[in-house]
């Protein structure tokens, strides 16, 4: 201990001297050197202090050594290598931390208001004493005193937990699973982000109660982002500027010695005896020594509130009762969890005070269930490993709690706890678990030493023995207590006989006959009789898995069964400890039970084993031989196969063949042959088939084999609707009159929706309209209104009363979970005890509910079930009555429901009551379903000598709706006419009727003559009956009236009037107006404000229709393109969603359908179906994209809503699909697909050829690992890291997803790495594809600009490509892009550029570019002929100038600004903040117009703010003469502005330019008017468009080259200082309606306005601008005047959306004219010069129709924007101060300032003089505006 202390002090003294130098080097080398990686925190034994914390997880060696130490002497001598390593940052910061804790204000740390629970964490004195008792918590002390044992504490808590406020469940799982490992306090810094990591640390240290998840925050950020995406609308108090960060130095290692535990969960609370807390309250301590709280008397002594705490890193068995005091004394972490628990308890108490006793009872039952579960978690289910401190097991990931003295041979066992997954295992002392769970230890040892383990040498596998029948049940089956029934023994004999004959078979007994037991008996027979010890693989659905496990324990306890399920860590644990004997490498288990899903996930592992037996439960999932599950399983190596299914045939003969082909592929090889032999065309087909099937299929039904099984009687109880139901029913029909009137022209889905609404109405009114929450006087009133709202409930109420008296037990089934809620409420009020099971009730709780109901002497009267819940494996034979509250579309589901009660073991007659509402759709559905189900549903018939077998070739309808449109129309009309005959408001209540009378009149069906779709039903029909039934049904179809005859006209009109009123209300709802502007956001995730707005909008519309969420959809004409539901038949919406998600993970997805099916868990779908869906998605997206682009040609109004941002969307069935994201992902992974060789051998040798940068992971990582990672992505899909890790061929098991969650690479790092590698791949492929064409293009494009070459070094590759990733690039060149010199790129180059753009999608933020690009491409293609005539002066822009670049090791230089997103680092942000301070008010108001302004006023407000801001930016840019600086700072300042609004920088800049342009135009108009009134117009040659482009976009030239003469309007700001073509990394989100599209259309056609064709800041033109100046120094005059105007007016045209007026709309004219104006031709004289003088007025006519003669007249922002004339000079109270004062920011580079800064902004000289000066001087003065 002392040595350790000395060491710390020594370090402390030496550290201060060299801290600064070390910090510098560490910041750079930290990631790769490991000097400050997580290894310091204990994951490496040699890392100094890491080893002091007794980690059990580093390796079992270090673990066992550490275990042997006593708590008093925890630290070990520091290893010498620790001294050599540079000390970690942690070792340099303890002193400062202490200061920081004590004097937070000194360091500017904002203290959270929450109380700090553990100030002592930085208490050097206490921590210096390392492991001494003074530092250990009280609870540990108590434990040590009580048990005289040293408890090993869990080091993961030493420094990891800074509180655990709201730990995510997933993290809990992982955290619990690998307790000692995750040390996340000091994540490994990422090289580029040092300051940010620091801030992360600071923030974490500020709050003791933060979740330990937070510690991962920095780790989660991908390297891609240079800075956080923050909104700067208001400064966050919690944020710290980079200036505030301090370098922290000081003694390290202290944190590691903090012994405090961490709360993982608070399980319960109680009032207990004071001081009765801590170790003495654990379950085992109480059992040994009694409960310290036993003698506590609440009346005599004062108690304290105590909480049952589950500790992090300890299993549930170690949970202790603690009071708040005891927790605070121990300085535990995670007290936030306790706060949350207390808060929740208070809420529950308040709630319990308000609700009825029944609710209280229900709540306490729930609590009891939960505490039962917690108790279960304290039971050891299985011991899976053992270790002693001497014999270790290698790396171990589980918590260990050794309390043993120095070296000892006492073993510890790794325990799997009941009800918890394998990932929750923990090491426990033998002394502890031996007391209660000795049997688990014994069975572990017997398993370990067992000789009955699988061997390939088993004789029976090679040569099957002769069959000997079992005359009676063998002793090894079920012992003495369990007996097989006769037919089960017969089944066992049949299975054994088939095995001896080498026939794989299908066991197809009816549900409830014990197929599970027969299968287990058969395996036990192989095990005992033939010494075949496995391995047996049994694949089962999740719902039956526990019953399989349970039956194995009962019937065959000698067989070692492993249940292989759970998350990755659980499965890894199973493979590590339960799989093979480490010495012999032979399998440990005999049988493995797993689910279909896990089988597919781990098919590589499971498929590598030779199975002696393969059994598939619910094998009808294999009916589709084209499905992935089928294809995967059929490839498994197995010696014998058994399919277990109660329903071997559904729909068609082919399904039966699929099953037969699976078990005996040699015998049933081809479907065509099978069909030919046994097709229905042959008269004796079925008899011959019967003979063929006999050896392979065994089918018994209950009534044949179990004579003792009582009868099943079904009664249909028809009930009247209540008056309220009738009203609702009529209202639904009337409201949907239009849809109904369409008849067969209507949509099936529309009809189905109406039928569903009506079915809901038949069940209960509350399903249509929930009751108002009135203050309920009594439970009785609630009960009455509940019952009166449904005719069925009136009847059920009477029925249940009768059944309760008779002592029956009832199952109530409903399809609708909300109906179950209503029934649960009813049962609660009636005080009937019940259980409930629906899809939301999971796993253990479900099992408990079933056990509770089936238990002997159970009080439960009812069991509520959803018809589809729980699969077929639920046994509720203790019930004798089934109530089917509402029938399913598919009667088969109802039959399964009945069978849950009517099963073997049932001793009473089973009564089934089916409730049907008279005269409604429900009654008609049941009648029709009865007729149809023979053909459409489950049709297998028992195999008997009669040969009556129903085998239809038609596939039947497998979807949930068995009816077509005609039938649905008829169903809807059924009963409606009679209903409408009752006068509205006078609907009759159902007649009171005695329950006995109802039952007497009910239609009764005995099971023998049942017409339900059971096997019994079919045996009553001869095959010949089928065709006639179909005909009869058609003949019986009765004539129906039309809907207009059924629904009275006055009711229809009434509804129409209501709808009209609603529409009018919606039209006048103002909030809708701003929706479009507000929707445009910088990134795709909706902000809070956005969601609030949407909420407001949706509340504005009360519409209940499908369109209610239209606002969230892209604003386009009409609704999203929809793909009809019948085109995706066989897929539910959920399945389609899963398919689409998986579709986006693979390259060329249509060729990878099997992988997609596996990923989407659609393995039982056929490949043909999957292909159909895949092609449907692909084709729909492609055509939607084309349509979208066409639409954009015609109109830009779509640019307003999110459609602009997200591109078009389509609907596949009910699933909305973002077209752009699909196409983007297809393109993204295409490169990978192309680069990976097809040949398997070549694929194994695949290696990346390009140079890659180092990965900086915590494992050795080279280019081979990168290559394997890409192969993994190719094989398993992007993001499926678990599968990649477990694939043995990839050899990445030990490299990725390390167990320690703070070690890299985890998922986030892998994702970043893969994105980077894909980028490199794309670059490599592009280079290959474009060499020749690139050279050619280069030669062509160089010619025009030989005169002037940019000085900056050229950093592009030889094809003119930016080195930046195309996915990041700001300027993805598009296919067919027309350059300004008129040369179109060569086709190859086009293709390559297109690829570049395609791939340009790494971040969702930047992914919007691409559609822009597509539009540009279309436009430019259309117009390329016209453009080709352009002059060489407008030379090629394919090469952009190079400014400052990032030089990154291992990759090419990236120009700054090209590869960065819209974010600023802290320093830049501060500079921008200072510079924009003068317009602070405008910034704040930009997004917050005053309430109550009209749309027009809002527009003006925003425009004014933008003009002020833009002018200010222009002013700031005058400080620079260097082009690159201007470009950079323009970008930065606009990005800064974008933080105040939801638009991105590019959009704002564009809007500003439009507003500016408009202002200039209006000033020009005004000037012309003034001129025409007051004198001759001076000569002003107008610049050609090209010159104007160059001029305006070149910021090193003045943005206002000509001074204003006194009589000219003053120029305001930078005269559109960014060219309209300025490129931004995101496409501009335009927000203009049709009315505004003119100018923009033209811009798009010529790659002009705001498109993607130029880099940010207008550098498209800088290569040739000086050349231009030479000849055209006058050229900009007229043009600039056109933009110089200070006055602008609101347009009188009514607009819907705020930003429309920014668009400069001109009349459409010939393209040549337009081109002339914008593309300079030095040889031609401008046609504009010959145009009439009023041409411009005409030109901009659409912008504004009425222009006042003078100035602005107060309509605009302020006086600042008036026209400036000499006579008005006095109004300018003072000129703007010189730029030196305006930009006094110390950080702005003085060297960049213009030499003319000091000149007066209103320096008036003659235009000639001024222009001559311009010509000679490149640094022009900008005219400064007053803002």
From Swiss-Prot:
Region Disordered: start-end pairs: 1-264, 1030-1124, 1329-1465, 1556-1638, 1679-1827
Catalytic reaction annotation: ATP + H2O = ADP + phosphate + H(+)
InterPro entries: CDH1_2_SANT_HL1, CHD1-2/Hrp3_HTH, CHD1-like_C, Chromo-like_dom_sf, Chromo/chromo_shadow_dom, Chromo_domain, Chromodomain_CS, Helicase_ATP-bd
Subcellular location: Nucleus
Biological processes, Gene Ontology terms: chromatin organization; DNA damage response; gene expression; hematopoietic stem cell differentiation; muscle organ development
EC class: hydrolase
Chromo domain segment(s): 261-353, 378-456
Biased composition (Basic residues): 175-204
UniProt key word Cytoplasm: no
Residues bearing the modification Phosphoserine: 207-208, 242, 1085, 1087, 1365, 1386, 1806
Protein function: ATP-dependent chromatin-remodeling factor that specifically binds to the promoter of target genes, leading to chromatin remodeling, possibly by promoting deposition of histone H3.3. Involved in myogenesis via interaction with MYOD1: binds to myogenic gene regulatory sequences and mediates incorporation of histone H3.3 prior to the onset of myogenic gene expression, promoting their expression.
PANTHER family: CHROMODOMAIN-HELICASE-DNA-BINDING PROTEIN 2 (PTHR45623:SF19), CHROMODOMAIN-HELICASE-DNA-BINDING PROTEIN 3-RELATED-RELATED (PTHR45623)
Protein's UniProt name: Chromodomain-helicase-DNA-binding protein 2
Originating species: Mus musculus (Mouse)
């Amino acid at each position: 201990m002392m040595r350790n202390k000395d060491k710390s002090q020594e370090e402390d003294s030496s550290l201060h001297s060299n801290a600064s130098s070390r910090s510098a080097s560490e910041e750079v080398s930290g990631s790769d050197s490991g000097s400050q990686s997580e290894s310091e925190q204990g994951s490496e034994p040699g890392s100094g202090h890491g080893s002091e914390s007794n980690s059990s997880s580093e390796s079992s060696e270090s673990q066992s050594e550490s275990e042997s130490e006593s708590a008093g002497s925890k630290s070990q001598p520091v290893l010498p290598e620790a001294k050599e390593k540079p000390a970690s940052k942690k070792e340099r910061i303890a002193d400062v931390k202490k200061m920081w804790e004590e004097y937070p204000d000194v360091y500017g740390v904002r203290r959270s208001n929450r109380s700090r629970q553990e100030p002592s964490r930085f208490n050097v004195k206490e921590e210096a004493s390392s492991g001494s008792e003074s530092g250990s918590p009280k609870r540990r002390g108590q434990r040590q005193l009580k048990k005289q044992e040293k408890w090993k504490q869990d080091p993961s808590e030493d420094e990891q937990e800074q509180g655990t406020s709201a730990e995510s469940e997933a993290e809990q799982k992982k955290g619990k699973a690998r307790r000692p490992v995750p040390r996340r306090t000091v994540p490994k810094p990422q090289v580029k982000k040092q300051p940010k990591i620091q801030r992360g640390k600071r923030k974490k240290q500020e709050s003791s109660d933060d979740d330990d998840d937070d510690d991962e925050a920095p780790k989660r950020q991908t390297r891609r982002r240079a800075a956080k995406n923050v909104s700067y609308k208001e400064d966050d108090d919690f944020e710290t500027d980079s200036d505030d960060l301090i370098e922290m130095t000081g003694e390290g290692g202290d944190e590691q010695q903090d012994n405090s535990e961490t709360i993982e969960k608070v399980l319960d609370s109680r009032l207990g005896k004071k001081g009765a807390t801590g170790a003495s309250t654990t379950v085992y301590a109480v059992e040994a020594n009694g409960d310290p709280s036993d003698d506590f008397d609440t009346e005599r002594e004062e108690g304290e509130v105590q909480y049952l705490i589950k500790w992090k890193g300890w299993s549930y068995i170690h949970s202790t009762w603690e009071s708040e005091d005891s927790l605070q004394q121990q300085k535990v972490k995670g007290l936030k969890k306790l706060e949350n628990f207390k808060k929740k308890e208070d809420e529950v108490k308040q709630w319990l005070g308000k609700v009825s006793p029944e609710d209280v009872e229900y709540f306490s039952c729930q609590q009891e269930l939960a505490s039962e579960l917690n108790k279960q978690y304290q039971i050891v289910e299985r011991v899976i490993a053992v270790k002693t401190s001497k014999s270790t097991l290698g790396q171990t990931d589980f918590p260990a709690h050794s309390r043993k003295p120095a070296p000892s041979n006492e073993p510890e066992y790794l325990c799997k706890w009941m009800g918890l997954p394998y990932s929750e295992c923990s090491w426990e002392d033998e002394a502890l678990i031996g007391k209660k769970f000795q049997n688990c230890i014994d069975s572990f040892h017997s398993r370990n030493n067992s000789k009955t383990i699988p061997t390939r040498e088993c004789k029976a596998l090679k040569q099957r023995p002769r069959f000997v029948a079992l005359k009676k049940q063998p002793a090894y089956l079920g012992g003495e207590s369990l007996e097989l029934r006769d037919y089960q023994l017969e089944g066992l004999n049949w299975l054994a006989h088939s095995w001896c004959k080498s026939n794989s078979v299908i066991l197809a007994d009816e549900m409830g006959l014990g197929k599970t037991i027969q299968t287990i008996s058969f395996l036990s027979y192989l095990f005992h009789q033939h010494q075949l010890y496995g391995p047996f693989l049994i694949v089962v659905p999740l719902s039956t898995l526990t019953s399989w496990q349970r039956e194995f324990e009962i019937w065959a306890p000698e067989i070692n069964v492993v249940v292989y399920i759970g998350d990755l860590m659980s499965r890894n644990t199973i493979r590590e400890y339960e799989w093979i004997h480490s010495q012999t490498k032979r399998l440990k288990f005999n049988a493995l039970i797993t689910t279909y899903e896990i089988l597919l996930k781990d098919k590589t592992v499971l498929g590598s084993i030779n199975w002696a037996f393969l059994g598939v439960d619910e094998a009808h999932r294999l009916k589709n031989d084209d499905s992935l599950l089928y294809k995967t399983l059929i490839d498994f190596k197995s010696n014998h196969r058994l399919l277990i299914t109660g329903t071997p045939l559904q729909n068609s003969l082919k399904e039966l063949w699929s099953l037969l082909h699976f078990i005996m592929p040699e015998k049933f090889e081809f479907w065509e042959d099978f069909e030919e032999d046994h097709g229905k065309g042959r008269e004796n087909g079925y008899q011959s088939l019967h003979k063929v099937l006999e050896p392979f299929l065994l089918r018994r039904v209950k009534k044949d084999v179990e004579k003792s099984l009582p009868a099943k009687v079904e009664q249909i109880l028809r009930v009247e609707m209540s008056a309220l139901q009738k009203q609702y029913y009529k209202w639904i029909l009337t409201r949907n009159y239009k849809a109904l009137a369409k008849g067969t022209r209507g949509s099936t889905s529309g009809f189905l929706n109406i039928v569903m609404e009506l079915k809901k109405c038949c069940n209960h009114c509350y399903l249509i309209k929930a009751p108002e929450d009135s203050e309920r006087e009594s439970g009785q009133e609630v009960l009455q209104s509940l019952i009166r709202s449904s005719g069925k409930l009136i009847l059920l109420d009477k029925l249940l009363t009768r059944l309760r008296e008779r002592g029956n037990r009832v199952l109530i089934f409903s399809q609708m979970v909300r109906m179950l809620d209503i029934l649960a409420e009813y049962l609660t009020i009636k005080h009937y005890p019940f259980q409930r099971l629906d899809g939301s009730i999971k796993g253990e709780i479900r099992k408990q509910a079933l056990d509770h109901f089936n238990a002997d002497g159970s009080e439960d009267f009812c069991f509520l079930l959803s018809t589809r819940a729980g699969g077929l494996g639920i046994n509720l034979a203790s019930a004798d009555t089934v109530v089917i509250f509402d029938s399913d579309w598919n009667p088969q589901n109802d039959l399964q429901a009945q069978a849950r009660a009517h099963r073997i073991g049932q001793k009473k007659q089973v009564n089934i009551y089916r409730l049907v509402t008279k005269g409604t759709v429900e009654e008609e559905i049941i009648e029709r379903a009865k007729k149809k189900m023979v053909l459409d549903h489950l049709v297998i018939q028992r195999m008997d000598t009669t040969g009556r077998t129903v085998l239809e070739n038609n596939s039947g309808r497998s979807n949930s709706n068995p009816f077509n449109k005609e039938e649905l129309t008829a169903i809807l009309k059924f009963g409606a006419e009679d209903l409408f005959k009752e006068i509205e408001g006078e609907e009759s209540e159902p007649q009171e009727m005695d329950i006995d009378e109802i039952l007497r009149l009910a239609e009764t069906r005995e099971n023998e003559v049942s017409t339900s779709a059971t096997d019994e039903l079919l045996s009553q029909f001869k095959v010949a009956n089928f065709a006639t039934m179909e005909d009869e049904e058609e003949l019986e179809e009765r004539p129906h009236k039309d809907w207009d005859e059924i629904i009275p006209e006055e009711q229809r009109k009434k509804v129409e009037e209501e709808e009209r009123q609603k529409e009018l209300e919606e039209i006048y709802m103002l909030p809708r107006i701003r929706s479009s502007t507000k929707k445009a956001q910088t990134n795709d995730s909706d902000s809070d404000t956005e969601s609030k707005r949407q909420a407001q909008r949706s509340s504005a519309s009360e519409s209940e229709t499908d369109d209610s969420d239209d606002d969230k959809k892209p604003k386009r004409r009409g609704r999203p393109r929809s793909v009809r539901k019948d085109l995706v038949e066989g897929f539910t919406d959920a399945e389609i969603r899963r398919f689409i998600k998986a579709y986006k993970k693979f390259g060329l997805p249509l060729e990878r359908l099997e992988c997609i099916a596996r990923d989407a868990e659609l393995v039982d779908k056929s490949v043909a179906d999957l292909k159909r869906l895949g092609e449907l998605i692909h084709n729909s997206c492609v055509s939607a994209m084309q349509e979208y682009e066409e639409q954009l040609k015609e109109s830009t109004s779509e640019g307003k809503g999110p459609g602009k941002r997200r591109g078009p969307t389509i609907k596949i069935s009910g699933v909305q699909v973002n077209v752009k994201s699909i196409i983007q992902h297809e393109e993204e992974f295409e490169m990978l697909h192309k680069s990976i060789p097809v040949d398997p051998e070549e694929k194994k040798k695949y290696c990346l050829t390009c140079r890659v940068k180092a990965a900086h992971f915590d494992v050795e990582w080279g280019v081979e690992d990168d290559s394997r990672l890409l192969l993994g992505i190719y094989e398993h899909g992007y993001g499926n890291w678990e599968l990649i890790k477990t694939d043995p061929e990839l050899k990445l098991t030990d490299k990725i997803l390390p167990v320690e969650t703070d070690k890299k690479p985890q998922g986030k790092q892998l994702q970043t790495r893969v994105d980077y590698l894909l980028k490199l791949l794309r670059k490599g492929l592009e280079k290959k594809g474009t060499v020749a064409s690139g050279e050619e293009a280069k030669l062509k494009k160089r010619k025009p600009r030989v005169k002037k070459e940019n000085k900056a070094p050229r950093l592009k590759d030889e094809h003119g490509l930016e080195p930046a990733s195309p996915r990041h690039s700001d300027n993805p060149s598009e296919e067919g892009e027309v350059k300004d010199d008129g040369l179109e790129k060569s086709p190859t180059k086009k293709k390559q550029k297109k690829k570049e753009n395609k791939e340009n999608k790494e971040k969702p933020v930047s992914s919007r570019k691409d559609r822009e690009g597509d539009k540009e491409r279309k436009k430019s293609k259309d117009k390329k002929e016209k453009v080709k005539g352009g002059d060489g002066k407008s030379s090629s822009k394919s090469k952009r100038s190079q400014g400052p670049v990032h030089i990154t090791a291992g990759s090419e230089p990236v120009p700054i600004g090209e590869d960065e997103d819209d974010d600023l680092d802290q320093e830049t942000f501060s500079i921008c903040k200072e510079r924009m301070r003068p317009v602070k008010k405008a910034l704040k108001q930009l997004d917050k117009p005053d309430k109550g302004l009209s749309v027009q006023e809002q527009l003006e407000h925003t425009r004014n703010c933008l003009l002020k801001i833009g002018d200010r930016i222009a002013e700031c840019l005058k400080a620079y003469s260097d082009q690159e600086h201007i470009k950079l700072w323009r970008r930065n300042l606009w990005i800064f502005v974008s933080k105040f609004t939801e638009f991105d920088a590019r959009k704002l800049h564009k809007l500003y330019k439009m507003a500016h342009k408009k202002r200039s135009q209006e000033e020009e108009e005004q000037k012309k008017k003034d001129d025409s009134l007051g004198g001759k117009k001076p000569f002003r040659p107008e610049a050609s468009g090209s010159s104007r482009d160059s001029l305006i976009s070149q910021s090193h030239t003045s943005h206002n080259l000509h001074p204003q003469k006194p009589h000219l309007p003053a120029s305001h700001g930078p005269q559109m200082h960014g060219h309209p073509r300025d490129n931004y990394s995101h496409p501009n989100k335009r927000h203009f309606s049709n009315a505004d599209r003119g100018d923009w259309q033209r811009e798009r056609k010529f790659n002009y306005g705001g498109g993607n064709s130029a880099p940010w800041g207008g550098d498209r033109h800088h290569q040739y601008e000086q050349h231009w100046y030479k000849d055209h120094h006058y050229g900009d005059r007229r043009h600039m005047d056109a933009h110089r105007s200070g006055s602008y007016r609101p347009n009188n045209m009514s607009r819907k959306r705020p930003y429309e007026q920014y668009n400069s709309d001109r009349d459409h004219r010939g393209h040549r004219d337009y081109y002339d104006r914008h593309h300079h031709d030095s040889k031609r004289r401008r046609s504009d010069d010959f145009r009439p003088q009023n041409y411009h007025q005409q030109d901009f006519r659409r912008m504004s129709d009425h222009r006042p003669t003078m100035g602005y007249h107060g309509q605009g922002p302020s006086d600042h924007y008036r026209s400036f004339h000499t006579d008005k000079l006095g109004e300018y109270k003072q000129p703007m101060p010189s730029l030196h004062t305006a930009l006094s920011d110390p950080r702005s580079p003085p060297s960049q300032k213009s030499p003319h800064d000091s000149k007066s902004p209103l320096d008036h000289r003659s235009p000639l003089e001024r222009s001559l000066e311009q010509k000679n001087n490149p640094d022009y003065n900008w005219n400064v505006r007053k803002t």
